[in-house]
Amino acid sequence: MDRPGPGSARPGRTVHVWGYRVEWKVRNGRKLQPSEWAGRGDLGGFKRRWKDTRATVGTTFRRRSRVSLVGELSKFPLPSDSSGGKSSSSFARGALAWCRQRNPNPSCAAAETGARTSLPKERCRGWRLGNWLHKHPHPNTCPRLPACWLPPILTERGERVPKLVPLLACYPKSKPKD
């Protein structure tokens, strides 16, 4: 009795289904596809080969998975949270408390108690257009953050803090007050 060598496939099976001749090969109990569909086919003088259609390791969530950058995006507090204004994010609360200890002024204290004076209710144009804009903010999208959000290096030196005025005003109707 002739047995195939190690690693070779068993002879193909032919089945007639509704007038069509269906042929497939089986290796180790798994169905294989001919190279006409799965590979290069007859291009370049290749032999007729069979390709294993099993998925390789690590392809389970390759297409449908989305990586949520929760840790990355939580570094930058948004002007309006998704909870409807009931409570701000934990990062914003912690940063406001730290800011009030270093530079106690009424805007920071009011923002921590719940009054929404430090962060505006309206958004600038294009503030949340996608993940790319969070990492590369357009100069036209100014979030109007309060003075307590300035870098600590400016407040440690005791220098006069410059007034933040955007180059292109987000709100053309409002005029700067002198």
From Swiss-Prot:
Keyword terms, alphabetized: Apoptosis, Cell cycle, DNA-binding, Nucleus
Domain of life: Eukaryota
Subcellular location: Nucleus
Induction remark: By p53/TP53; direct transcription target of p53/TP53.
DNA-binding region: 8-50
Principal localisation: nucleus
Entry's Gene Ontology cellular component terms: nucleolus; nucleoplasm
GO molecular function: DNA binding
GO biological process, one term: apoptotic process
Record-annotated membrane-spanning stretches: none
Disease note: Cowden syndrome 4: A form of Cowden syndrome, a hamartomatous polyposis syndrome with age-related penetrance. Cowden syndrome is characterized by hamartomatous lesions affecting derivatives of ectodermal, mesodermal and endodermal layers, macrocephaly, facial trichilemmomas (benign tumors of the hair follicle infundibulum), acral keratoses, papillomatous papules, and elevated risk for development of several types of malignancy, particularly breast carcinoma in women and thyroid carcinoma in both men and women. Colon cancer and renal cell carcinoma have also been reported.
Function, as annotated: DNA-binding protein involved in S phase checkpoint control-coupled apoptosis by mediating p53/TP53-induced apoptosis. Has the ability to inhibit DNA synthesis and S phase arrest coupled to apoptosis. Has affinity to both double- and single-stranded DNA.
Protein name according to UniProt: Killin
